[in-house]
Amino acid sequence: PTSALLLLPVYRRVSRLFRLSDLMRCNGLVAVALTVALSGTVQAQSSGDDSSFPRKTNTSEAQQARQAQDAFEQTHRQGLRFYNGGADATCEEEIGRICYWNNNGDVPAPAERSDAKVERTQLISILERATKVSSDDDWIMGMLVRYDIEADRPDSALKVARACTGTAWWCSALQGLALHTLNDHAAATAAYQKMLNTMPANLRCSWTEIGLWLSSDSASQRAYRARPCEERMKSDMKLFRLAQPLWSLPSNDLYNELLARHTMSTVHGMGRIPYDIGWGNDLLESQVRYGWPVNWSVQNGGVGDPRPPSVIGHEPTPSYDFLASTTALANPFSATSADWPLNRKKARMRYAPRYASGYGIPPYQFARFRRGDSTVVAGAYRLIRELEMGRAPYNAALVLDALDGKDPIVVKRDNAPANAALLATIGATPFVASLEIVAPNGRRAARVREAVQPLPATRMVSDILLTTTGDPSARPSLETAASMAFGGADIDGGTTIGIYWENYLNVTPAAPGTTLIRATRVGASFLQRFTSALKLSKAVQPVSQRIQDPGRPDGGPGRSIALSWPQVPDGDYLLTLVVQNASGRDSTSTLIRVRDRK
């Protein structure tokens, strides 16, 4: 994503390296103390005395640090490189003075000039000297953590944050920011919880509210903010849980990201930034919704455009909208994978997790099997080329959450293959299932999430699980089928797949059963139905089999066959399986999508 400011002054590119000390002498800069009205920020009292936040010291080292920070950002802005992307970009969101557009997949931001990196290192050295005599200076500690993170030194940022002796809640916030940047999710959560427990109540309400993520309607925003803070924070936990990118992680990194955005925004509001405007609520909103910029550039409007270049702030890419739909929020136990559209247009928020350079939705299938009063859920996946997961190993997880405050059911498999199924047992209540695969080498993640209902005790047949081949043994089992799960419902015409199901009727040689298997095209035309009725085409019903079932010698329910799928037109086909004998009849179906190999 990229945000750009419009109608800004023309900036002169700087080609030579300025030493910060020289620039400060030449310009006669003095210490700058910006007082910014951050949304919800008040004169917060630090623990132990009456000093207000941000606490600032007046040592010579502190004054030099403030001068150096202001000088660095002036030079930084003047030397920004021109951006060659965004030719077709239009404002996706106009936020005050900011034009925001999503540039996932666009030209990357230009590399930062090398002298800017040197200048930042010089600034860090000045800030480090200041911390040795002013570790209780909230401004200095915040700036040093900020620039350590900008310089890709998160370990140094954490060391600085842990040495902070200023306002208690602010020191915890800086620790949370550094830990979040390091992907230490559990420790970041602990640090931010400590921050929330010690910061002023009205500031805590401001930092945790997510009205900007939910709706652009002002009435909805007012209604959201009108709710009592503690009530709102409690109900928001459901939204954060459903939006958490990976349930297999030890903590909710999206919640940490919200607090990290507020932390970094507070630091940005304390001093100069590359945008040549004062801090304001529009900048705060932009960063709370889409994150803070990690690269900067400038761009002309083109030939004949009289406007001066715009400063462009580039947030991390690719980024995604992890929020569940309003339908899923209202009724999560009826949700489908479509309720988590990662690439939603005109998203109210986006997030680029640092532990994964890309997210995708894999081909998948959930299938259910009875075990007494319980249900075994099979979550099958397949890693396809388009996911760009890279080489093995892969770590897979199936997480089922009843959203009742209890610990979720978690099944993990390290060194997982590219296609398989994980098995988990649930009771009589519905769950939301999250099937997750992470590729550590490729730094990619794939995830699918939808509701799973227990298989009713009255059902006489399980769901259908697609497998790569049939199991010819006399005792097919779910565990064997899971190991060769096809993963997904997209197949090529003219191929053979396996199917596994379980028959819960009392089938014996004395009371044999019959299994009917057929596939019917969804939305077939009149001509296709007519030619199929005359047996001239298999386009409407490519599969039709009747199997005699005398039961298994051991009485087990598992069944498996190989299913030949003829070459048929692309489209959706409903695969239906019917089991019956003298004691009863039942059926199950699953949707198959046939793709053209060409």
Indicate residue ranges for each PLM-predicted region:
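Helix-turn-helix repeat elements of alpha-solenoid scaffolds
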Residues: 73-76, 80, 111-125, 146-158
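Bacterial N-terminal signal peptides
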Residues: 28-39
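Alpha-helical repeat scaffolds
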Residues: 120-130, 154-164, 187-195
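A cross-family detector of function-defining hotspots
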Residues: 225-357
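Intrinsically disordered, low-complexity terminal regions enriched in Ser/Thr/Pro/Gly
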Residues: 53-96, 100-103, 329-598
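TPR/TPR-like (Sel1-like) alpha-helical repeat modules
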Residues: 165-167, 180-203
